[in-house]
Amino acid sequence: MSSSYRMELDKWLASLDVKADMVLDIGGSQLPVRGRTKTWVVEDYKIADLPEPHIESPKPDIEVDLNSHSSGLEHDYDIIFCLEVFDYVYDPYNAFEIIKLGLKKGGIAWVTFPMMYPLHQPIEDDALRYMPSGITKLAKAVGLKIVQMIPRRTETDAIYNAFRTERMRCAKHEDHNISGWIVEFTK
């Protein structure tokens, strides 16, 4: 069974209408966006991923490593999806630059960011978690504009209750049942 974190993303994707000439799915080898949205009217769809993304995953159309300074993105995409990738990114500034480089002016990038997620496989690649202010600062630094930040909420209050039990000082007047973000950027 999928995690509530994944189910929240799938629910959001199932409500999304996608209509574009060119769409890039960064990290999409394992679980492509195509086939998961409400509607899909796309002329040219490409997957960009690591050369050997996952065991038994298809090879990507374009080889891209968001932690590397050579991107391989040479097109202006109308829409870029980068879902469930940023927990493996240890150079987020570079990753933001690559997304900006691939996005056409006025295009949209949908990117997910984990805020709370346990260490997971492959553990040697699991790197970072993101807070809203960090996402905002990275976007501003590379010249991307945030259109919206959609919170991904936990199903229960268990995580917040764990913070309280451990006497961690949570910021007042904030929702501590948010486990991550779905962010819409534009160039």
For each of these PLM feature ranges, what is it?
Residues 54, 70, 89-90, 139:
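Activation segment
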Residues 79-85:
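A short beta-strand submotif of the Rossmann-like class I SAM-dependent methyltransferase core
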Residues 29-33, 52-53, 68, 86-87, ...:
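Short, solvent-exposed loop/turn segments at secondary-structure junctions
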Residues 18, 90, 104:
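Short conserved AdoMet
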Residues 90-98, 108-187:
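S-adenosyl-L-methionine-dependent methyltransferase catalytic module, highlighting the catalytic core
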Residues 25, 82, 111:
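Redox-cofactor binding/interface segments in oxidoreductases and associated redox assembly factors
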Residues 1-75, 79, 179:
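Conserved N-terminal segment of class I S-adenosyl-L-methionine
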